[in-house]
Design a protein with these regions (language model features):
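Hydrophobic residues within well-ordered alpha-helices
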Residues: 12, 55-56, 95, 108
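A ligand-binding cleft/hinge motif common to bilobed small-molecule-binding domains
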Residues: 28-33, 54-57, 61-90, 128
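Flexible hinge/capping segments at coil-to-helix
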Residues: 1-17
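Short, well-ordered beta-strand segments
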Residues: 16-19, 63, 96
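Ligand-binding clefts/hinges and TM-proximal coupling segments of bilobed small-molecule sensing domains
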Residues: 24-43, 82-84, 113-138
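Beta->alpha turn/N-cap motifs
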Residues: 1-2, 20-23, 47-48, 64-71
């Protein structure tokens, strides 16, 4: 929450954390054994919204989730949340195409490039995530 004294990952030592079961957040946490061992307790929930509700009710000190998911939930659901600048792990997204369908891949990439150049991607990002989370392809 915005009024939390947690400002960096180190501040989570001994704290109770919620995350969605079988999520990329859980995988990232499991890959950082020392960090995971430093936590007080980890509560797994069925959904990210359930994890955020645990935070809102005060049953956990923080929620671990993908930044894009967090920004979306904060922007669209509202709430008095903050996202730490420091990440536990980096994650990138991509679009998959049927192997060999280079024509469709190239058309989609050309459209994405045009939207990045004219600022449309940035505008969409700010609308849905509250900030520009786009990544340059160059």
């Amino acid at each position: 929450l915005n009024n939390s004294k947690i400002t960096k990952l180190d501040d989570l030592k001994g704290k109770k954390l919620a995350l969605q079961l079988d999520s990329s957040a859980e995988k990232a946490l499991n890959a950082k054994a020392d960090f995971k061992a430093s936590l007080g307790k980890v509560l797994t929930t069925s959904t990210n919204l359930d994890a955020l509700n645990e935070l809102k009710m005060g049953s956990v000190d923080a929620v671990l989730m993908d930044e894009i998911v967090a920004q979306y939930n904060i922007t669209k659901q509202g709430g008095n949340y903050k996202v730490l600048e420091e990440a536990l792990a980096e994650e990138e997204y991509a679009v998959g195409f049927l192997k060999g369908n280079t024509e469709l891949r190239d058309k989609v990439q050309a459209q994405i490039d045009a939207m990045a150049k004219d600022g449309t991607l940035s505008k969409i990002s700010k609308e849905w995530f509250g900030k520009d989370v786009t990544v340059s392809n160059s």
